[in-house]
Amino acid sequence: MNKNIVILGTQWGDEGKGKVVDCLTKDSSYVVRYQGGHNAGHTLVVNDKKIILHLIPSGLLHKNVIGIIANGVVVSPFELIKEIKMLETHNIFVHKRLFISNSSPLILQYHIEMDIAREKKLGISALGTTGRGIGPAYEDKIARRALRIGDLKNEKTLSIRLEKIVNYYNHQLVSFYKHKPVDYKIILRDLLPTIDLIYDMIKDTTSILHTAIQSNKKIIFEGAQGSFLDIDHGTYPYVTSSNSTIGGVITGTGVGSKSLDYILGVTKAYSTRVGYGPFPTELFDDVDKHFSKKGHEFGSTTGRKRRTGWLDAVALCRSVRINSLSGLCITKLDVLDGLHEIKICTAYKNINTLEIISFPDIDEWKNIEPIYETYPGWNKKTLGIKKLIDLPYEARNYINRIEEITQIPVDIISTGPDRSDIIFVRDIFFIKK
């Protein structure tokens, strides 16, 4: 039996991981966020109510589940408290079953101001960050100057270290970026009241997870963003600041690779991307309008319109290999309903050399042309279908072709936004390794 399951995105984020996590954690004991921050946006629809989570693990909507925000996550205490209070309006109370790693770096106002100042100075060369301070917070971690969640437990030390780091940031903000400075006293004043609200949640989460594994508890590891936003394996520099591929699970939790039983890659039935960066299958036609309208392709974190395109199987296959995926979950299959034909990108061609490229360098992307296979679409609605056999023949053929190209099984298919709109082809908890 598979106890410990990783769920991660195979594209550029927004694949629908939150819903999949929500569906699988009803039978689990723990759900763990291991990287990213509140730049993630996991949208769940429960009883026709939309709930968007940016920081708290999606599986906490189930009242029997314990949530972990592990050491790989950068945490804004203000955003965390805001989410906790939002969940309480839905009668979901998490104070006694949510734990935060004492090693998680803090996101504070100076990170946000630095993020905004940099994007403004870059102008048309901006990376398109969410402006929430994620990158600067990870920089502090790597530079070994970060304030961490555990520092909140010692007010005197916190005050001294905070003043030093505010001075460091203000020197850059004012002198180089010509940006307004931040006020150390205001940051400290606003931060102190948050301590009492989350004090009891601050734990050594690595030890909690080790104990859970030794006790044979089921654990879901919930990824944020997608594989091609990974700082090392993504379309650099148009990436996030953390490891959103499988390596982020290990470093971001302290759980060893041998403890991971099954790795599920979540992919849309087509492709989307928010912000700048390479996107070889991008569309600018009526199909783009179809995807945007029917798929509601607007970012849950930024509200920006997502770029849309056909499924990129070259990128998907690379993601399969990078993450050692056990199986796939195809989401938003219903968005393809009504299309006359459907395409899959199976190779990249350099338009100058006509050479087939496995995965381009950053300067090569502009010369890449996708090579497509074309398949017939379907007119029957797939929305809400719960059995594989009930899908139209053409839809099943499309799924089969994805399995052939990637050489791994499609174990789950999402056919709509509600948590009940799902096909479990195989029970991933009981698939033999």
From Swiss-Prot:
Note accompanying the cofactor annotation: Binds 1 Mg(2+) ion per subunit.
One annotated Gene Ontology cellular component of this protein: cytoplasm
Positions of the catalytic residues: 14 (proton acceptor), 42 (proton donor)
Subcellular location: Cytoplasm
PANTHER family recorded: ADENYLOSUCCINATE SYNTHETASE
Self-association state and partner proteins as the record states: Homodimer.
Protein name, entry field: Adenylosuccinate synthetase
Species the sequence originates in: Buchnera aphidicola subsp. Acyrthosiphon pisum (strain APS) (Acyrthosiphon pisum symbiotic bacterium)
Lineage: Bacteria, Pseudomonadati, Pseudomonadota, Gammaproteobacteria, Enterobacterales
